[in-house]
Amino acid sequence: MIEPTREVEHLGLRWNTKKMTVSLTEKRMANIEEKAENIKRRGGCTLKELQSFLGKLEASRAAIVIARLHFRFMQALLRGKEDDKEFIKFNEKAKIDLQWWIDFARKHSTSPLQAPRLAKLNIKTDASGDAGWGGHSRRGWTQARWERKEKHKHINWKEMEAAKKCIAEHMKSREHVQIEMDSLTSTCIINSMARSTSATLRQKALEIWEIILSNQGWLTQNGYRKRRTK
């Protein structure tokens, strides 16, 4: 007699239909930790090894939903590299990414199959080139002028900084923030969990997500507004 199973392992993932969760198997998690420790000891790895390691991290996303936030600076090391045997020395940002997989990945290696129900909060933000920034939600308005050191930043940085400030001001615990911005570029960087050729914008996206996750919430883009031209 065949008994139905409530737990299935496939490609390093364990699917549990009783608990409604997906987890990395112990073997897969231990392998990632071992590879990370090895790279840390050497201060880097070859291009081929880095590509293989990043492939393992990408494959973990079903169980570790915030995985992308913790490999973008390692991913950036691939840019311009072609020789599989070339040794790539990790910079400080990449080392921080790597350390997260050693210290914290296991704690995040199980995720619910259904997203938790969170109260929704819509926030609309805007950033002016020279004047300042602002935003509003059902909780009211927030606005300020740029500081002198911020005035000469790129407009995409300003759009993301405006979003960060408004989220920090308006968001409460366990809310799903839906944010609307003017910049398509900034929208894509936030949605992709910090995928960008710019290290500055990657860092800004990480700061935004840090606020969201520290409040046990989530973030999605509610589209972007195309600027009107006269």
Identify what each model region corresponds to.
Residues 1-9, 123, 216-230:
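Acidic carboxylate-rich catalytic motifs and surrounding loops in phosphoryl-/glycosyl-chemistry enzymes
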Residues 10-12, 32, 36, 54-55, ...:
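Mobile genetic element proteins and their domesticated derivatives, centered on retroelements
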Residues 60, 67-70, 130-133, 142, ...:
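Flexible loop/turn segments at secondary-structure boundaries
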Residues 2-112:
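C-terminal reverse transcriptase regions that engage the nucleic-acid substrate
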Residues 132-141, 174-181:
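Short coil-to-beta-strand
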Residues 116-130:
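Two-metal-ion RNase H-like nuclease active-site motif
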Residues 167-229:
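RNase H catalytic domain
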Residues 38, 137-161, 169, 185-196:
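A short, polar/acidic, helix/strand-boundary loop motif
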